[in-house]
A protein has these predicted regions:
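Transmembrane alpha-helices and membrane-interface helical segments
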Residues: 40-45, 87-92, 163
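Membrane-embedded alpha-helical hairpins and interfacial helices in multi-pass inner-membrane proteins
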Residues: 72-77, 92, 99-181
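Residue-level signature of the transmembrane alpha-helical core
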Residues: 13-17, 37, 41, 54-62, ...
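Hydrophobic alpha-helical transmembrane segments
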Residues: 23-30, 51-57, 91-107, 160
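Hydrophobic transmembrane alpha-helices
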Residues: 1-45, 51-52, 59
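Juxtamembrane membrane-interface segments at transmembrane alpha-helix termini
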Residues: 46-54, 67-72, 90-97, 118-119
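Residue-level signature of transmembrane alpha-helical entry/exit and packing/kink sites
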Residues: 4-15, 36, 49, 53, ...
Length: 181
């Protein structure tokens, strides 16, 4: 594993900010954003170090949520485990897999992540609001349409994996040639 340095700190913090901005830019369209796309691309290129960007994204989301709601909004807590799940799935893709396979798997993982977002969010809802089984099923079924929208949005966003992946690979190769630390 490469040594972590200042350049990496700036790079992965910037990616974390991009994750947050991709969420904000599409705010008017429920559950459509570029977070899954960026998690996939950053993880394909930078592998395990991509988790840093996800943690930065979660911290920015937490701080803005707490500031905007004067400390009374906890909806971001499930992000602590929901987005690392997608990262883990992408980490399971072998480094040497053909790019077409990587893109196909990321598209499937992103779609499933969007479709199952409500299911992954449910444990927090059950604990936070003391939901019984009937209430949990009602909450989950009320959000199915939003999970379907989330899935479709994630799959559509994944059409950008190839150009973003190629761009990041070129930038990383250029960085290696110039020996930036």
């Amino acid at each position: 594993m490469k040594k972590f340095n200042i350049f990496d700190m700036v790079l992965f913090t910037m990616f974390g900010v991009l994750l947050y901005l991709s969420d904000i830019v599409f705010e008017l369209i429920p559950n459509v954003h570029g977070v899954a796309l960026l998690i996939c691309v950053i993880t394909l290129v930078y592998r395990s170090r991509a988790i840093i960007s996800i943690l930065v994204y979660i911290m920015i989301t937490m701080v803005t949520s707490l500031v905007v709601s004067a400390g009374h909004s906890l909806w971001w807590i499930p992000y602590i485990y929901i987005f690392p799940i997608l990262w883990l799935l992408v980490m399971l893709i072998p480094k040497k897999a053909p790019l077409k396979v990587k893109i196909a798997l990321c598209t499937v993982f992103s779609g499933l992540h969007g479709l199952l977002f409500g299911v992954m969010y449910l444990p927090f809802q059950v604990i936070m609001y003391n939901l019984n089984l009937e209430m949990a099923i009602a909450w989950l079924s009320a959000g199915v349409i939003f999970d379907v929208i989330h899935m479709v949005g994630n799959i559509a966003m994944c059409s950008l994996i190839y150009p973003l992946y190629k761009t990041l690979i070129k930038l990383e190769e250029s960085r290696q040639k110039k020996n930036y630390r």
